[in-house]
Amino acid sequence: MYRVFASRALRAKSLCDKSSTSLASLTLSRLNHSIPFATVDAEELSGAHPAEVQSFVQGKWIGSSNHNTLLDPLNGEPFIKVAEVDESGTQPFVDSLSQCPKHGLHNPFKSPERYLLYGDISTKAAHMLALPKVADFFARLIQRVAPKSYQQAAGEVFVTRKFLENFCGDQVRFLARSFAIPGNHLGQQSHGYRWPYGPVTIVTPFNFPLEIPLLQLMGALYMGNKPLLKVDSKVSIVMEQMMRLLHYCGLPAEDVDFINSDGKTMNKILLEANPRMTLFTGSSRVAEKLALDLKGRIRLEDAGFDWKVLGPDVQEVDYVAWQCDQDAYACSGQKCSAQSMLFVHENWSKTPLVSKLKELAERRKLEDLTIGPVLTFTTEAMLEHMENLLQIPGSKLLFGGKELKNHSIPSIYGALEPTAVYVPIEEILKDNKTYELVTKEIFGPFQIVTEYKKDQLPLVLEALERMHAHLTAAVVSNDPIFLQEVIGNSVNGTTYAGLRGRTTGAPQNHWFGPAGDPRGAGIGTPEAIKLVWSCHREVIYDYGPVPQGWELPPST
């Protein structure tokens, strides 16, 4: 039944014509068959019409006798077979990475025409994603494997396209811009260059099946690296289709390998291939293990328990409530930037903010996927966490806290109403055990709400200081003194400040990444690409001439 609901939601919007949705959806369904690179039909993908996902290595698509059969997150039907490489099939991937030298596939001194090639590939790929039928294809495919509203899925495609547009033409070679400094004598100059790592690996999660892997993959390629890409198998069909689009747009077949495997197999490849750099986006637990396994040759964008502080100046309550709802519950809370804790100044507590949050949360429905399956926590696990929180003195359930009604979501996933639990700030900070419980990240539609009085800002800042992940944050205030105090005493790498502050969004036009950790990665901007996918190399030219009358000096 819910596959029907989802299909209706998928058809409900069109990127190109919101005024005639029925006609547009019918047309796009027919046009899917003319998408030149596609090997699946997102509209038909179901238990009755399953798909198979392949890996790609050394310029060829390959299958496997080892299949991971995925269940439809909406109804439990087996609907995708992922041909996963097992430990006996890793050697081609290890060999492929080993064929790339440390100095990369291109650098400022080697094959510089490839900078132009990738500007052209970006141009063509951006053009493809600007075609309504292609954009709709990816939005609907995202919805099938990581159920979210059409607007959220289409937004992911839009950000991906804008990123590609940002690196068209000469913009790729501009990433490799060098600088020169005059030397100590005639004929000497020092030049600083951005240098690739060579063989690299990329491991990305399920929640943004297109945006995260594509932006990191292209950043790695722009700087001259040869990447091996692994996307969570639950959603890897999206990036498999994107790989086919990139090949159609001129991506050299030997430049990228793409693998479907379990974590154990991928870990084996990492240890044997010894990549010069790995980008990992995902859980903190896996991130710390990989940091040890790879001896620090890693960049991380791991989990974030992200917070929002509402300042003393109350205004635009409806807007702030709406943004809080979006930050906490869009994509069913499955964003690494999702609002996990809301600090409410006592002035806001005098407004109908919480009641408005409850009303907004109750608007979310499974039928349009504004609330949907949670892919990494079961319903039981989330409810158990809620019950543990409610044992804290003074805590209470603000809204939610129940399993979704009338759903067919398989039990391996979660199905929870948007939920908020209030915990007094004094109790949060009472002891380490309570603090760890309250700040446990639940990757789902779940948030903690607390209140602070005007003289309790130091308690808020203490709570922020004790957090171990520092990805996104929001300080909702137009009071410059308050903003200065909170921003100056916090760390989060992507912090939104002001009345319209949010924790989510992650567009392509600004840095997105954690702070406070030398291993922290960024995504999307020239600065992020250069930081993650290149290192500094200094070349000192010293041509002479040797000074006239030079004589052999004494030993020193």
Curated annotation (Swiss-Prot):
The active site is at 301 (proton acceptor), 336 (nucleophile). InterPro entries: Ald_DH/histidinol_DH, Ald_DH_C, Ald_DH_CS_CYS, Ald_DH_N, Aldehyde_DH_dom, ALDH7A1-like. The keyword Oxidoreductase applies. GO terms for biological process: proline catabolic process to glutamate; proline metabolic process; reactive oxygen species metabolic process; response to salt stress. It is found in: Mitochondrion matrix. Induction: Induced by treatment with proline. Induced by drought stress. GO terms for cellular component: cytosol; mitochondrial matrix; mitochondrion; plastid. PROSITE patterns: ALDEHYDE_DEHYDR_CYS. PANTHER family: ALPHA-AMINOADIPIC SEMIALDEHYDE DEHYDROGENASE (PTHR43521), DELTA-1-PYRROLINE-5-CARBOXYLATE DEHYDROGENASE 12A1, MITOCHONDRIAL (PTHR43521:SF7). Pathway: Amino-acid degradation; L-proline degradation into L-glutamate; L-glutamate from L-proline: step 2/2. Signal peptide: none annotated. The record marks 207 as: Transition state stabilizer. Disruption phenotype: No visible phenotype under normal growth conditions, but mutant plants are hypersensitive to treatment with proline. Hypersensitivity to heat stress. This is Delta-1-pyrroline-5-carboxylate dehydrogenase 12A1, mitochondrial. It is an enzyme of class 1 (oxidoreductase). Its EC number is 1.2.1.88. Highly expressed in flowers. Constitutively expressed at low levels in the other tissues. Highly expressed in pollen grains and tissues undergoing cell death. Expressed in old leaves, mature siliques and developing embryos. Keywords: Mitochondrion, NAD, Oxidoreductase, Transit peptide. NAD(+) binds at residues 282-287. The gene is ALDH12A1. Plays a role in the inhibition of programmed cell death by converting the toxic proline catabolism intermediate (s)-1-pyrroline-5-carboxylate (P5C) to glutamate. Belongs to the aldehyde dehydrogenase family. GO terms for molecular function: 1-pyrroline-5-carboxylate dehydrogenase activity; aldehyde dehydrogenase (NAD+) activity; cobalt ion binding; zinc ion binding. It catalyses: (S)-1-pyrroline-5-carboxylate + NAD(+) + 2 H2O = L-glutamate + NADH + H(+). Its main location: mitochondrion.
